[in-house]
Amino acid sequence: MTAHDADWSDRDVSGALVPGEGDIDVSLRPRSLREFIGQPRVREQLQLVIEGAKNRGGTPDHILLSGPPGLGKTSLAMIIAAELGSSLRVTSGPALERAGDLAAMLSNLVEHDVLFIDEIHRIARPAEEMLYLAMEDFRVDVVVGKGPGATSIPLEVAPFTLVGATTRSGALTGPLRDRFGFTAHMDFYEPAELQQVLARSAGILGIELGAEAAEEIARRSRGTPRIANRLLRRVRDFAEVRADGVITRDVAKAALAVYDVDELGLDRLDRAVLTALTRSFGGGPVGVSTLAVAVGEEAATVEEVCEPFLVRAGMVARTPRGRVATAQAWTHLGMVPPAGAAGLGQPGLFD
């Protein structure tokens, strides 16, 4: 691992799941739709899908959950299985490299099981094509042998519900997307919703969290429950070591300053991207690959981890010619925006 990798690999404000925190995250997961905070529209729709299937005594349509990481897609998959009283089988798109990998998993399903495929947009094409038939007709054709002597053997699959999760719904092929009977897009959380998430998590973890402190952490959590819970744990560490264990607003502010999370929830990598965009490229436009090289990161990391929040926060604008720093980005970095900065003189355009 390089020094640079050490800097960014454990970002507290990344929506990605950090190794070693899985057990804690499991304890904080809601176990029913009633416990799930936020996403009211999605919850209502899922409730109808689940109750309708239970009333008919059948399996629900296949379900696709899309949205940025850390919003609760995996939790909802677990809840769907629990609400149906079914077993949950879990895998991921990258793990299904061959059709045989998927066939083995499908053959072990029993009726009404829920199969959860995370990052389904990354499933290999042979496995995806096998999935088409399994989703529609609950059977798969397994090819035995090679060349002219190859034989296709049909295998029945127990009726099941597929729950797919993706952070890039546009990367799904049309045939796969069309086979989902219900699609839900999950939105970023409002600060008030994140305060509820933090209050619930604090209760489970036995943390004394003041209302003002919860508001402070929620405001810097980038609209993402996973980040809110992660920051809560880091602030707890600070409170136990450098304070009396009680998390007040001042303690939360001091802790978040130590972890380089600023008032808007930006961390060092976010600020590095903005700094490169403004100082090295004069505000842009600049391509994401060039921008990634400037900060020493992979283009995918900049595009999938940093950029969504920076765009949503009104700091970066995506244009046909590349990424452009808005007037708000210049101001946030303590610089005077140039006359041509995006959004300058257009109040509310990026609010």
Swiss-Prot record:
CDD domains: AAA. It is found in: Cytoplasm. It catalyses: ATP + H2O = ADP + phosphate + H(+). SUPFAM superfamilies: P-loop containing nucleoside triphosphate hydrolases (SSF52540), Winged helix' DNA-binding domain (SSF46785). Residues 263-351 are annotated as: Head domain (RuvB-H). It comes from the Bacteria. One of its GO terms (molecular function) is ATP binding. Mg(2+) binds at residue 74. Its EC number is 3.6.4.-. InterPro entries: AAA+_ATPase (IPR003593), AAA_lid_4 (IPR041445), DNA_helicase_Holl-junc_RuvB (IPR004605), P-loop_NTPase (IPR027417), RuvB-like_N (IPR008824), RuvB_C (IPR008823), WH-like_DNA-bd_sf (IPR036388), WH_DNA-bd_sf (IPR036390). Keywords: ATP-binding, Cytoplasm, DNA damage, DNA recombination, DNA repair, DNA-binding, Hydrolase, Nucleotide-binding. DNA binds at residues 318, 323. Residues 190-260 are annotated as: Small ATPAse domain (RuvB-S). Residues 1-189 are annotated as: Large ATPase domain (RuvB-L). Pfam families: AAA_lid_4 (PF17864), RuvB_C (PF05491), RuvB_N (PF05496). ATP binds at residues 28-29, 70, 73-75, 136-138, 179, 189, 226. Has 3 domains, the large (RuvB-L) and small ATPase (RuvB-S) domains and the C-terminal head (RuvB-H) domain. The head domain binds DNA, while the ATPase domains jointly bind ATP, ADP or are empty depending on the state of the subunit in the translocation cycle. During a single DNA translocation step the structure of each domain remains the same, but their relative positions change. Belongs to the RuvB family. Homohexamer. Forms an RuvA(8)-RuvB(12)-Holliday junction (HJ) complex. HJ DNA is sandwiched between 2 RuvA tetramers; dsDNA enters through RuvA and exits via RuvB. An RuvB hexamer assembles on each DNA strand where it exits the tetramer. Each RuvB hexamer is contacted by two RuvA subunits (via domain III) on 2 adjacent RuvB subunits; this complex drives branch migration. In the full resolvosome a probable DNA-RuvA(4)-RuvB(12)-RuvC(2) complex forms which resolves the HJ. The RuvA-RuvB-RuvC complex processes Holliday junction (HJ) DNA during genetic recombination and DNA repair, while the RuvA-RuvB complex plays an important role in the rescue of blocked DNA replication forks via replication fork reversal (RFR). RuvA specifically binds to HJ cruciform DNA, conferring on it an open structure. The RuvB hexamer acts as an ATP-dependent pump, pulling dsDNA into and through the RuvAB complex. RuvB forms 2 homohexamers on either side of HJ DNA bound by 1 or 2 RuvA tetramers; 4 subunits per hexamer contact DNA at a time. This is Holliday junction branch migration complex subunit RuvB. It comes from Mycolicibacterium paratuberculosis (strain ATCC BAA-968 / K-10). The lineage of its organism: Bacteria, Bacillati, Actinomycetota, Actinomycetes, Mycobacteriales.
